[in-house]
Amino acid sequence: MVVVRLARGGAKKRPFYSMVVADSRNRRDGKFIERVGFYNPRATGGEESLRIQMDRLTYWQSKGAQLSDTVSRLVKQFGRQQKAAQPQE
């Protein structure tokens, strides 16, 4: 089964996660098919903490990819950020 999940990177005590599309049988930080975004939980100041390529994510979902619990929570958060960033008319 194809799954969209987070792969951990970064240094010790300084996590950085890549949002990847991978086969569920592969290791968390192992081989993946495509990188569709990132999540930086320790972003400070003007650093970007979350970026998702929504077009690629919807493509993989249409192909049957399942989102992990954490990724689905981050997608909802990203949607709220995008909605807040759009100018009100």
From Swiss-Prot:
Q: Which UniProt keywords apply?
A: Ribonucleoprotein, Ribosomal protein
State whether keyword Nucleus applies: no
Q: Which Cys pairs are S-S linked? A: none
Q: Does the keyword Ribonucleoprotein apply?
A: yes
**Which Gene Ontology BP annotations are present?**
translation
The lineage's top-level taxon is: Bacteria
Q: Which PANTHER family match?
A: 30S RIBOSOMAL PROTEIN S16, SMALL RIBOSOMAL SUBUNIT PROTEIN BS16M
UniProt similarity note: Belongs to the bacterial ribosomal protein bS16 family.
Q: What is this protein called?
A: Small ribosomal subunit protein bS16
**Protein species of origin:** Nitrosomonas europaea (strain ATCC 19718 / CIP 103999 / KCTC 2705 / NBRC 14298)
Q: Corresponding gene?
A: rpsP
